[in-house]
Amino acid sequence: MELSRRDFMKANAAVAAAAAAGIVLPVKNVQADDSGIKWDKAPCRFCGTGCSVLVGTKDGRVVATQGDPDAEVNRGLNCIKGYFLSKIMYGADRVQTPLLRMKDGKFHKEGDFTPVSWDQAFSIMAEKVKATLKAKGGNAVGMFSSGQTTIFEGYAKVKLWKAGLRSNTIDPNARHCMASAAVAFLRTFGMDEPMGCYNDIEKTDGFVLWGSNMAEMHPILWSRISDRRLSDNNVKVVVMSTFEHRSFELADTPIIFKPHSDLAILNYIANYIIQNDKVNWDFVNKHTKFKRGETDIGYGLRPEHPLQKAAKNVKNAGKMHDSSFEEFKKIVEPYTLEKAHEISGVPKHQLEALAKMYADPAQKLVSFWTMGFNQHTRGVWVNHMIYNVHLLTGKISTPGCGPFSLTGQPSACGTAREVGTFVHRLPADMVVMNPKHVEICEKAWKLPKGTIPTVPGYAAVMQSRMLKDGKLNFLWQMCTNNMQGGPNINEEIFPGWRNPENFIVVSDPYPSVSAVAADLILPTCMWVEKEGAYGNAERRTQFWYQQVKGPAQSKSDLWQIVEFAKYFKAEEVWNEELMAQMPEYRGKTLYEILYLNGEVDKYQVPTNIPGYLNDEADDFGFYIQKGLFEEYAQFGRGHGHDLADFETYHQARGLRWPVVDGKETLWRYREGFDPYVKAGEDFRFYGYPDGKAIILGVPYESPAESPDEEYDLWLSTGRVLEHWHTGTMTRRVPELHRSFPNNLVWMHPSDAKKRGLRHGDKVKVITRRGEMISHLDTRGRNKCPEGLIFTTFFDAGQLANKLTLDATDPISGETDFKKCAAKVVKA
């Protein structure tokens, strides 16, 4: 078979991706025979990069995937996980039917999982929800979902939970990974999400990675960074982390810093900029304002924890006070080169070189960060601090210059943040605490005034605590695996799930750790078994069509949400005051009120697409995905969140919002790029009425838990290239599982020697919360400094999150998975 140049490049890219993971691909797989295969586009199911792939189907199955050569994001490339996308749906243990714990023919908390019908499943769910609402009110009924559900599913969830069941206890697992970034974006700019785009990679002169192993977690973007670095010797890469990983292989300046000390480093950089007269005064005076944050704000622990009791400003953690440049200068002034070195352990010459990069007006610079930055008990502060240095120098909203928060899930932006599936949010950056925002939603959704509660519900970690304490009694977990992925499993998560007062539902395609701990498992369609839409890290919205059917009785998350709404009549969940405003809703179901409202149900299924599949539209009798999207899109149009029309996204490889007059926006807030910035304004941060971004003064504060005499090591957790999050999908791909079958604990050889341990030894990692048996690695891809160990959480056989501390950022509620105290002994 002859290969074109494009085919040859794609084939070699596949081999390179496999080699990075230690996988040898059979020669026949490099350019497989595609006769009889139908190809269509879809965004990748894994990280937030938003790669587009071509999905090959034959005889009702996905048989192959390949990088989409027409996609701007990945340009025909796949990482190793993307290469094996075709296998994620075909694990031998797919859940085929709803499974309810039963004993003697009825539900029993300690019963065995027994097949039931969808009607039986929804009936007992509705019974539990109605009883809980009657006894304790809306916030005792919760949903925990993710940035992996589609935009349509997220929007349907928000409507059912916040409007239908009148509960704001709905949160995504993005609370564990992106909440601090989102909160800091909103506080700094008045709007969420990055102002730049991936085009910055090819236009910048320098990259600084803060707590981000892009080589393994965002490998396609890393390939673009590598190409930029290797094509121009003037381009520099700085990689900053608490341990050495694969991204260090490209670093011109590799920096290892002590956990939590990024706060001190960033304040030093701000101080350096000021002391060396490198402030861009024209930009700062025109486009910024100064605020001061509260200090001593606690650690998001239970109120009775000594650290919480000792903190002075727990209740005002998020408060910002008007300030000035002079006050900001005083806040950062103590962070000298000497002090930053003392706190961080970073050599002075490296700190100074880093500060000079940010300060040099001729140096274009992009800052990238992910979980090492966000999963932090001062995550909001540290996000503010990175914005501070970009704002002080004016290196923002400009090609090749900007702060860029990367996401870890395919639609953490599109579904969790933009749609508003957080406890406090509504679509398009609106919030439940703002009466005007609530009024806008109630009017658009044709609801009685006062339907949507105005107080946030229980966020992720609080959901676990409230389940344990008996204040949250119904939880529906969808498209995530918190029993493995959440913090402090033994003490805070498992007790609540098995609390006999509570009823736990898990929608999942596989029997995950969460699923087997639940009371009811609902079999769920995956990826291209449904029509969907994702929003990636650069504000790019991407659509795909359903391409195959799900197995047996599997149903999409969208179908489950909307169908479940049929089990509630308005008067069963709304009070008489609401019913009196709209008596015509009496006797109607939430399905009729929320989804047969003349908006969601007004589009017919297309008849001009050969082989078109849409199981949800077939069941409901209308094009529900289009109806949901067009209703949702109205909230952002004209307000800086403009989305294109539905059909456009099916034709394109995604568009970056705001999309105005058919044109996407690459750089927000900048004249000439953003249609919301008028001629002559240069920059305008229009999330705030005055168009100014906030520079926030906050100090370094110590972490919630540090090593001591007994627990003498830092423990940090994260991921590896081959597996994604809790491994529910990737561990069912034989090639990925074989390449990295089990979790390891990485340790410095000197630390191992002190403990009488050697590479490969079976060890026990112990913290104040739990212990885990694993094997030691002192030679592998991750090289820890003395005093720190690193492990991953993909392995259901080890459950690393038995070890982690459930401390959170007090402002965002995001969990700090990156630092707690541990000890290691031979097992």
Swiss-Prot record:
Enzyme Commission number(s): 1.9.6.1
GO biological process: cellular respiration; Mo-molybdopterin cofactor biosynthetic process; nitrate assimilation
PTM remark: Predicted to be exported by the Tat system. The position of the signal peptide cleavage has not been experimentally proven.
InterPro entries listed in its UniProt record: Asp_de-COase-like_dom_sf (IPR009010), CT_Nitrate-R-NapA-like (IPR041957), MoPterin_dinucl-bd_dom (IPR006657), Mopterin_OxRdtase (IPR006656), Mopterin_OxRdtase_4Fe-4S_dom (IPR006963), MopterinOxRdtase_cofactor_BS (IPR027467), Periplasm_NO3_reductase_lsu (IPR010051), Prok_molybdopt-oxidoreductase (IPR050123)
Cofactor entry: [4Fe-4S] cluster; Mo-bis(molybdopterin guanine dinucleotide)
Keyword 4Fe-4S appears in the UniProt entry: yes
Signal peptide annotation: 1-32
Pfam families found in the cross-reference section: Molybdop_Fe4S4, Molybdopterin, Molydop_binding, TAT_signal
Cellular component GO terms, alphabetical: membrane; nitrate reductase complex; periplasmic space
Binding site for Mo-bis(molybdopterin guanine dinucleotide): 81, 148, 173, 177, 210-217, 241-245, 371, 375, 481, 507-508, 530, 557, 717-726, 801, 818
GO molecular function: 4 iron, 4 sulfur cluster binding; electron transfer activity; iron ion binding; molybdenum ion binding; molybdopterin cofactor binding; nitrate reductase (cytochrome) activity
Positions with a binding annotation for [4Fe-4S] cluster: C44, C47, C51, C79
Family statement drawn from the similarity comment of this UniProt entry: Belongs to the prokaryotic molybdopterin-containing oxidoreductase family. NasA/NapA/NarB subfamily.
Function as written in the Swiss-Prot or TrEMBL entry: Catalytic subunit of the periplasmic nitrate reductase complex NapAB. Receives electrons from NapB and catalyzes the reduction of nitrate to nitrite.
Protein's UniProt name: Periplasmic nitrate reductase
Organism annotation: Haemophilus ducreyi (strain 35000HP / ATCC 700724)
